[in-house]
Amino acid sequence: MDIFDLKICFYFTVLLSLNIFSQTKTDGWEEGSRYNKLFSNKIDTLSGVVIKVSHSTPMQGMAEGIELEVQSGKDTVTVQLCPKWMAEYLSLNIQPKDEVVIEGCKAVCKGTHIFMASKLTANTIILQLRDDKGIPIWDRLR
């Protein structure tokens, strides 16, 4: 391997490291972010049927996240689960028509009423997304 090849390998490694760091460390979903400051310890429970699963960016500058539209009685509720990369890491497979029970809190984000999930029960899975203090579990994976 000559010096030119070593330089290319070095630059590629640095760029890859910066890209991974930028996607996970400061994606707007972390504890202390503007978004997570919306989370309240006043936990409610929501149950219903998933109408739609989509990707959304809750606030400007955030990484994409997973969002559900859940029919709960006569209401349709927007539920924000977690960053997209976390759902991919967990191989999360939530589909329309799935029955769900979600614990979390109500919040207003960009003028829209949302439900920020802390625990999801669907099909045969129970997924804890935040601890008792509202700290996202994905912060432990960074």
Name what the model sees in each region.
Residues 86-102:
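Short nucleic-acid-contacting surface segments enriched for D/E, G, S/T with interspersed K/R
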Residues 17-19:
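N-terminal signal peptide c-region/cleavage motif recognized by signal peptidases
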Residues 24-45:
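Short boundary/loop segments of OB/S1/cold-shock single-stranded nucleic-acid-binding domains
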Residues 107-136:
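OB-fold/S1-family single-stranded nucleic acid-binding modules
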Residues 42-62:
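Structural detector for short beta-strands of small beta-barrel domains
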Residues 51-55, 79-90:
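N-terminal post-signal-peptidase region of extra-cytosolic proteins
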Residues 59-81:
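OB-fold (S1/OB) nucleic-acid-binding surfaces
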Residues 1-10:
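Bacterial N-terminal signal peptides that target proteins for export
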